[in-house]
């Protein structure tokens, strides 16, 4: 089945979700809304991307609509989500990627325009969070607004799930070495709530907070209260890496842990958890669609109960693909219940 989808917010994630949708067999984008971009500029921004290259396809503007690979995509510029006429386009599933409407109450505004479900492409304080490969099977169709969690949670959770299922995690600390994002500054500037975050993104390694590790406890209840973490924002434009240092319940050699992750990457988590023994660096994974790519050669073990595991993620491309995978999963569930 093909799901008709609308996107609200045509920023980094909105546009990368759109690019991924062109390749996704289950999804058709029929409408986009962004109050800050007019259609001609949206065409330009979708066509040319400094990180992911030129769009592989055709894009034109016809009146106020985009024509992408010959198909019409309605383009709206509404500031109020409840005013977007999703019903007119047939869009039942909405990707909420503004970064502004991240609570159930705010994102529910889309339902007034005819949307059936809203998937927030960010963590949410109150909407149920789902991570593909980890807890999507707990979806029961009751919530009209759900969250795809964060890119870092999507990287960490599959890794933590395999390790916890096989060996048990007593406790763990996560560090994500994260590429800079749109919220940061090109040169030093005001950032009242996060002084360090206001420093020049391309000049500094910037310690930062992240709720990604604690959020794993929401998608894997067994790990609730057992993980926390922090971030370093670094001067790279895309691709990030998670370092999970954890204490294991059952003793296991590093080789045994590697084997378990390799098996999962070829089995139940294929397409979500990748595995590599190559001598890779971050740019090698630009455009990788996995949520998490375990780097077998980068991790270390102090003893059979204390281990550091390293896993990469394209924080734009891989995450955006999961947004669509979750959306597709939810639509299929809804159609059969």
UniProtKB/Swiss-Prot annotation:
CDD domains linked: GAPDH_I_C, GAPDH_I_N
Recorded coiled-coil stretches: none
Binding residues annotated for NAD(+), in chain numbering: 12-13, 34, 79, 315
Pfam families the record matches: Gp_dh_C, Gp_dh_N
Record-annotated active site: 151 (nucleophile)
Record-level GO BP terms: glucose metabolic process; glycolytic process
Binding-site residues, D-glyceraldehyde 3-phosphate: 150-152, 181, 210-211, 233
Top-level class of the enzyme under EC nomenclature: oxidoreductase
Domain of life: Eukaryota
EC number: 1.2.1.12
Gene Ontology terms: cellular component: cytosol
Gene Ontology terms for molecular function: glyceraldehyde-3-phosphate dehydrogenase (NAD+) (phosphorylating) activity; NAD binding; NADP binding
Catalytic activity as recorded in UniProt: D-glyceraldehyde 3-phosphate + phosphate + NAD(+) = (2R)-3-phospho-glyceroyl phosphate + NADH + H(+)
UniProt pathway: Carbohydrate degradation; glycolysis; pyruvate from D-glyceraldehyde 3-phosphate: step 1/5
Signal peptide: none
Intracellular or extracellular location(s): Cytoplasm
Record site: Activates thiol group during catalysis: 178
Subunit structure: Homotetramer.
Protein name: Glyceraldehyde-3-phosphate dehydrogenase
Species name: Podospora anserina (Pleurage anserina)
Gene name linked to the record: GPD
């Amino acid at each position: 089945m093909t799901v008709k989808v609308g996107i609200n917010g045509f920023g980094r994630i909105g546009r990368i979700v759109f690019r991924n949708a062109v390749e996704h067999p289950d999804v058709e984008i029929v409408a986009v809304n962004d109050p800050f971009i007019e259609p001609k500029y949206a065409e330009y921004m979708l066509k040319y991307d400094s990180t992911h290259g030129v769009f592989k396809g055709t894009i034109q503007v016809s009146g106020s609509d985009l024509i992408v690979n010959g198909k019409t995509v309605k383009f709206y510029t509404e500031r109020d989500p409840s005013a977007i006429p999703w019903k007119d386009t047939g869009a039942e599933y909405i990707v909420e990627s503004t970064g502004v409407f991240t609570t159930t109450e705010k994102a529910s505004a889309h339902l007034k325009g005819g949307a059936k479900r809203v998937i927030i492409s960010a963590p949410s304080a109150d909407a149920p969070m789902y991570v593909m490969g980890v807890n999507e099977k707990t979806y029961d169709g009751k919530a009209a607004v759900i969250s795809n969690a964060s890119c870092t949670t999507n990287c960490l959770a599959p890794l933590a799930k395999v390790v916890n299922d096989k060996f048990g995690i007593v406790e763990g600390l996560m560090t994500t070495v994260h590429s800079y994002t749109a919220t940061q500054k090109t040169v030093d500037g005001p950032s009242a709530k996060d002084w360090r975050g206001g420093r020049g993104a391309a000049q500094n390694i910037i310690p930062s907070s992240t709720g990604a590790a604690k959020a794993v406890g929401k998608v894997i209840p067994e790990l609730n209260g057992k993980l926390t973490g922090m971030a370093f924002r670094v001067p790279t434009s895309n691709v990030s890496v998670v370092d999970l240092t954890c204490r294991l319940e059952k003793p296991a050699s590093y080789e045994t842990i590697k084997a378990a992750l390799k098996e999962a990457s070829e089995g139940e988590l294929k397409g979500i958890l990748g595995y590599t023994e190559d001598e890779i660096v971050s740019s090698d994974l630009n455009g990788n669609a996995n949520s998490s790519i375990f780097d077998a050669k980068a991790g270390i073990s102090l003893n059979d109960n204390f281990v550091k595991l390293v896993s990469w993620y394209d924080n734009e491309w891989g995450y955006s693909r999961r947004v669509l995978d979750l959306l597709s999963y939810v639509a299929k569930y809804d159609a059969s219940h």
